[in-house]
Amino acid sequence: MFKLDLQPTEKLFIPFITAGDPVPEVSIELAKSLQKAGATALELGVAYSDPLADGPVIQRASKRALDQGMNIVKAIELGGEMKKNGVNIPIILFTYYNPVLQLNKEYFFALLQENHIDGLLVPDLPLEESNSLQEECKSHEVTYISLVAPTSESRLKTIIEQAEGFVYCVSSLGVTGVRNEFNSSVYPFIRTVKNLSTVPVAVGFGISNREQVIKMNEISDGVVVGSALVRKIEELKDRLISAETRNQALQEFEDYAMAFSGLYSLK
């Protein structure tokens, strides 16, 4: 299980990529680039054919990965390959619950341990149904990451009391995707979560530029960035796949990712 021990001036930068997008070997290089860009941890998404929480950018990434033959087992194994190839930040598997159910639970957790996967995030599993999975995570030393969206304070307290690693604070209702601005009600909500939580609070769903990062960093411990990075991968995909242009495209991706991280001011 991992703990994110932050220095007072340090902020979380937790990027999301889809395992196998655009191709598995490039996913490994993208993870290394994100680590160099200052990522605190990595969310590794499992491609799924019916991604309820995801907007069009991540849906297209899922399709590209599924076209490569990716599934939950291969995604976990890809996480293991990342660890073997120099990725030493925590890797959190982001998966819908159905692919987990289709595997034997014992086999699923054995795979996570064998491949040194540090955390698990299941976006479509409500609090009431997550207790047994949280217990399994504890017994296998995998950190279960809790998602919180605007809800009653008593429910918030219940979710946050059980939180480990960090609390993933959902900035907008609806699906993932780049947003130009957020509803003003999100800011008091994030402050409430921050006041209740004893673990770091990261804000995600829609973070797409440096200005939003600065704003969210003022009231939280950092950000989760998904669609903006996945869209950049989509834009660079042909150059990432080609051996001749890959290094240059990876550098471009790393420079882009750095704008979301604490390393930005060091450039």
Swiss-Prot record:
Pathway the protein contributes to: Amino-acid biosynthesis; L-tryptophan biosynthesis; L-tryptophan from chorismate: step 5/5
Subunit structure: Tetramer of two alpha and two beta chains.
Active site: E43, D54
Protein name, as recorded: Tryptophan synthase alpha chain
Similarity comment text for this entry: Belongs to the TrpA family.
Protein's UniProt keywords contain Amino-acid biosynthesis: yes
Function: The alpha subunit is responsible for the aldol cleavage of indoleglycerol phosphate to indole and glyceraldehyde 3-phosphate.
Entry keyword annotation includes Lyase: yes
Catalytic reactions of this protein: (1S,2R)-1-C-(indol-3-yl)glycerol 3-phosphate + L-serine = D-glyceraldehyde 3-phosphate + L-tryptophan + H2O
Keyword vocabulary terms for this entry: Amino-acid biosynthesis, Aromatic amino acid biosynthesis, Lyase, Tryptophan biosynthesis
GO molecular function: tryptophan synthase activity
One CC-aspect GO term: cytosol
E.C. code: 4.2.1.20
